[in-house]
Amino acid sequence: MNERLAAEQLLAATGPVPDEPPRDKSPLRLMIVTEDEPFHLAETFEKLFAVSPRWLDIVGVAVLAFAPVGIRGSRLTLLRALGTRYGMSNLLRAAAVVVGNRLRPRRRLGTVLRQSGVAATGFHKLDGEAFAAEMARLDPDVVVTIAFNRIVPPIVLEESRAIWMNVHLGLLPHNRGPAPVFWALHDGEHESGVTVHLTADEVDGGAILAQRRRAIDERRLAVEHRALRLLSVDVLIDALTGLRKGVAPSRNSDLAARWRGVPETSHIAAFLARGNRFF
């Protein structure tokens, strides 16, 4: 589905509504696509369920296996690549956080979803029959990708009735790409933020639906990442509210000049040399 048709379709399906819509108006059906990110995702969902407006119905969550950007393969391949890229000490710290979160039920995504009564279904990929069947069963108005380190296949967007949007932890069009929090700290920037945009063929290139800024007051990536994840819930609600009211998205311009890719070893060395830390 192209960007121009996205907002038109949502309005045709639900119509613009005020902040507190009448109780008899059909709720907006939202499906979430994510990866089982072991750091801050459970907290993010916990906040989303706590603050969701009455007109929002979260009908299901599709969960794919977590894999850091640019690394695919066996667990051994993953560990070797992460150790080489980020250093063994940072890898061990990350492992300690992951194990600690796995041992605490409240920090597990599955626990949060079960307590909220929202069904979660695991998938290996989005362009398969299983995911297509789940989309048909849930029949969402909107699908949002959160903490999703993959590209949504174009065929999925083309064949979907739903509007697709993405949550990006950066101020688009600045720092497009898979590691916006890293690059904001790497470059010594003093503010970052969250952008929710329509999903397009161009990665992080869809029209902007909502955006909020936040001062960077901590040079540890994990702390900043958590703060932005929690802020992303508010920005997502802003975006969905705007679509329901018929607010036109803004153009995501200057795409070619704003792309930042996966950090290389030299970038990580510079990141640390400037006083930043991962944990």
Placement of each model-derived feature along the sequence:
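One-carbon transfer enzymes
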Residues: N2-F279
